[in-house]
From Swiss-Prot:
The protein, known as: Serine hydroxymethyltransferase
Main localization of the protein described in the UniProt heading: cytoplasm
Entry's localization field: Cytoplasm
Cofactors that this protein relies on: pyridoxal 5'-phosphate
Amino acid sequence: MLPKELEEIIDVVLVHNNWRRRETINLIASENVMSPLAELVYLNDMAGRYAEGTVGNRYYQGTKYVDLIEDVLTKRFAKALGATYVDVRPVSGTVANLATYFALVPEGGVVASLPVKYGGHISHNTVGGLKALRLKMVELPWDLDRFNIDVDRARKVIEEAKPNLVILGGSLYLFPHPIREIAEIAKASGAYVLHDSAHVFGLIIGGVFPNPLKEGAHVITTSTHKTFPGPQGGLIAAVVEDKVNDLQRAVFPVFTSNYHLHRYAATYVTLVEMEHFGAEYARRVVENARALAEALAEQGVPPVAEALGYTRTHQVAVDVSKFGGGDKVAAKLEEANIIVNKNALPWDKSVLKPSGIRLGVQEMTRFGMGKDEMREIAKFIARVLSGEDPAGVRRDVAEFRKAYLEIKYGFKIDRELVDKVFKSLSLYT
């Protein structure tokens, strides 16, 4: 018998699993689910191990199999991205960002990036990572009509401020940033260019979003668990050979010691699966995002950037100020088992009072949903926003999800493999 308090915690985990995997429509743009195979190999002994240092140069013994996996994972990502340097040791996208800033920007240096209301991530801003490293920030200007960076005004900002680093990419990211144009301007001013690819990394691997390294960026940073449906983790990929040592030292010993080694095998599985299934998956994700946006507009819940076709990524952004704002709407949708997040939009006076919500279709696409299902999701959302009791919508959402429980775009597993993994960990004999 387990102690009661442990039974209670286990029950919470099981209830959560059932709720999020089987009963909700998850539209959080920064989340996803691993394939069954990736999730299986994520359960491994490396979860309790250390491997400080780099492949072949560790501060601990017992790392020969860690070295093997990290080496093949690094090389496979380098080939996929056309990078001369890849580091899979950062434990998150933010840690990857911080390490890159530390390596490329001198103390007291200047970074040009987007503020949060224009889609920049908090780690690109002085409320987050830049403040921690005491770096200065200049804002990249925004063109509301194009819902993108204003290249002409950005040229003036970069030429006048002469930043050490220009950051592109973001957390609200509907359309590819003008990477090539900004990279040319930045390089002429002596700045490095970093593209935070966390949200669109799976779309890059899947070939439906431009590869920033081929567009002129010096560095890609990313997480490995959004449109790239792997375990939570981070990655740096670069084409700056003169800064490799600085990047390596920034990752360790400055910002990490333990790299959460158990994620390596699952990340490798995910990369191989994306090589096999990623092109179709990425194409479907972008199609579904556009379909959801169009269906929401038909339901009287119009997303932003209609004139531009709403989106070219996995994301849809909706101004819900007339429905009570982002806080209220996100909470009300959760009552109906529709999970979204509140999000600031470019015209908001304060990011603490966001007028919008952000939706992402990558996880529901992973469960096999297509354009028809996006139209059904739009109807569920519209019912809640029109004032219908969320409890009734919740019942319909749970019933709807029953047909979409199998994770697609990955390899299958069988009981024999599950038994091998469990026995290798002595979970049973």
